[in-house]
Amino acid sequence: MSNVEILAPAGSLDGLYASFQMGADAVYVGTSRFGARAFAKNPSVDELKEALVYAHMHDKKIYLTVNTLLSDRELENDLFPLIAPLYEAGLDACIVQDVGVLSFLHENFPQMDLHASTQMTILSGDEAELYRNYGVTRFVPARECTIEEIRAMRAQTDLEIEVFVHGALCYCYSGQCLMSEEIGDRSGNRGMCAQPCRLPFTSAYGNGHLFSTKDMCTLVHIPELVDAGIDSFKIEGRMKKKEYSAYLSSLYRHYVDVYESEGKETFQALVQNKESRLWKDIRRSKDIYNRGGFCAGYLFETDKKNIMYPKKNGHFGTCVGTVLKASKGQAVFRVKVALHYQDILEFRLEDDTKAYEYTVKNEAAPGDVVTCNVKRGSTIFKGQKVYRTKNAALLSWIDEKIETIDDKISLKGKMTAKIGKPIALKLQGLSHEVTVFGEPLQRAVNRPVTKDEIEKRIRKMGNTNYRLTDFSITLEEDSFVPMGEIAKLKREALAAFEREAVSGRSVGEQKPHKKKELLVWQNASILKVSTMEQLRTAVETDENDVWIELPLALFAKEEDEVIKLLQNRPVILSFPRIMKAGAEEKWRTLINRLFVGAVVINSHRALLVAKKRFKDCPWIAAETFYHENERAKEVLAEFGICQAIKRGYGRKEVMVTKGCLKRTLDRCDGKRERILVSGGKGDKFYVVNNCDFCYNTIYTKNGEKKPEFDKPAWHHFTWETADEMRKVLKTWNLL
């Protein structure tokens, strides 16, 4: 049996069962609340309890998504009654983003596995190890990680590693995106992402769906993924139809099995032969869903531009033909693949926008010339590409396969019957076994019972979900048992087998929240500066009232002037939000010359660096190192981190991205730049590239300026001039 789990999305109950039937070993699914896909057709708690019985009898698993940020009220009042019945029904794990939720679940449901969500932005094995003591047994690295980084994680930890191998890619690091909340007041961290990144934007360098990524497909890379030591291959797509998750589950299960059973040489032969079943299956999976074709994701793509497709959003389909002739009301095109009744085609303009949609009336073979009527006024021209966005025959085939799969549970049976002793019947399935006992076996008065008679009665499963594939019996000679007793024993054994599929775990009352001491930054307001001009302005403030946050990546090249300006004034160090192990060594000399008064914890890597190098000064959580509830703040305190102080002035960072806008638009020159992008509804953002670490930060166009004088505030300056900065400082009585 394979050690690699195929983990499928289940956006509905139908999708859950379909994925299991087509080869998924586990599914991840939300329920009524707290999942990252609030608008999926999530099953109810009762439906999930039934699904858990089905899953466990088929040796499958169900993971519940609780991967959003919760308020104190939700955490203390609503989460326990949601999870408790599923825990008792044997829920296999919860996928979690909020560290407060992590702490709560580990305390109240200690026997349940917890998986750290990709929303936690974990970039290494030692970062994941931070949460082992909170019950984490598995983590999902950020989708921006490369296969080399995944291999390194495997060497760093024995925690299970779950990696996205197929489906949509977010432009922003998961969990770090605030764009949906900013544009439409629908927070991705609350499960309501509206995907505004898929909308068209304009910029001075180019227009289009500037932040829209292709979908990922890694079928050809299965050998590298398996050899990297990944435990679970995760397919994205809880908002997609059941046919999507079911079909992709079958493909990834099949090709993992091919590699594991037949080896690398056989698999590479499939990859090299473009007419192999592997490539045909990849083309079919494009028919199911793709955006701009497929890419290999950040796991394998070396050029980030290959990950983007700015010309079109939504299902791209597959190119099926080219227009040969266009006339008023008609289009003539040659097809290169088979077309089926009820396929949906799109005639597209050169910019990939839809010119006309056509539903196929008659089947056509590759090479056939098809004539179709089109609406007058539609832009149809010779050489125009025709795409299929719905493959009706493929969808029907998947549905038929789901319907006809025999998912009865195979059992092995063994009966032991000795005169004077209770008859024992043992049933063994994939995941568990049971033994039940009946009445004592009698000595025969007339005709003895035969093994064949007993086996015939045991094998009759009727309308149950079981089949008996193997049966053995030890029967003492000259014995007798009524067939009714055999039937009763079989019913009791099947009932016991089904009961055993439920965990048998029990949970008492919710444990009261014993509040712990929190760490709070109380020293002063904080000014985060980004330019030397701003640093010169910041030192005009009173160091008793104001501390300066110094982003090391922005000031390393000005080391001598920085030291001269600060003159032993204590500073707060901050590292890039996305930072790999060892990167801090780039700034070692600057760090050693500074009077480090505190460190900003804006990532797990920053926490690990602080634990190693800055044990004797306070650590302050950035607002993006989420701690929305009291329990999350307590977890930070256990790490030694002060909770963030409230934001004052500053542009909001709505995205931090591995993708680079300048690279997408062929403007990559290695120079830091600020690019204004505008959305269709007047939304404006600035994109700023960080070439040293090759990522972008996207900011709101304007800063927040409302003064709050009752407490210290954290002010973020980006590219303000000295005069603009002084004006803000005076408004806040800091100058």
Question: What is each PLM-predicted segment?
Answer:
Residues 135-136:
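As written
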